[in-house]
């Protein structure tokens, strides 16, 4: 827990939450969500998208970029542990834990996060690269 606290101490107050960030609004309780888990540092909820039966999002409660999350050390480790725990619970036949970085990866939220997806055979990661 100290890692997220340390991360929040390094960020200016304006970066701790963002009024324009959907995920910050969820953390603040200003938007509805189907919460799965919450502690002092992370929040897990069902994605509104339903491309596959299980689509969970794991976010830090402090507004951080994807890069900041992945460089956070203990916080990323805790998020990863929770991803595995919930993946095992919700998708006993298998799941993916992933993160998108930037436009080509179709990152739609600038608040860093992990995805846990599954509940169905997921197939290949991408189309055959030779088709591009």
Describe the function of each predicted region.
Residues 1-132:
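HIT superfamily nucleotide-processing domains
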């Amino acid at each position: 827990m100290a890692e997220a606290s340390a991360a929040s101490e390094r960020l200016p107050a304006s970066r701790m939450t963002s009024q324009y960030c959907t995920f910050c609004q969820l953390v603040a309780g200003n938007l509805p969500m189907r919460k799965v888990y919450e502690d002092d540092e992370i929040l897990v909820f069902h994605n509104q998208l339903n491309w596959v039966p299980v689509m969970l999002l794991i976010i830090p409660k402090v507004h951080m970029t994807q890069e900041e999350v992945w460089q956070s050390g203990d916080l990323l480790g805790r998020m990863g542990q929770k991803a595995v725990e919930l993946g095992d619970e919700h998708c006993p036949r298998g799941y993916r834990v992933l993160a998108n970085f930037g436009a080509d990866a179709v990152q739609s939220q600038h608040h860093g996060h992990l995805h846990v997806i599954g509940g169905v055979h997921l197939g290949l990661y991408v189309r055959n690269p030779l088709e591009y």
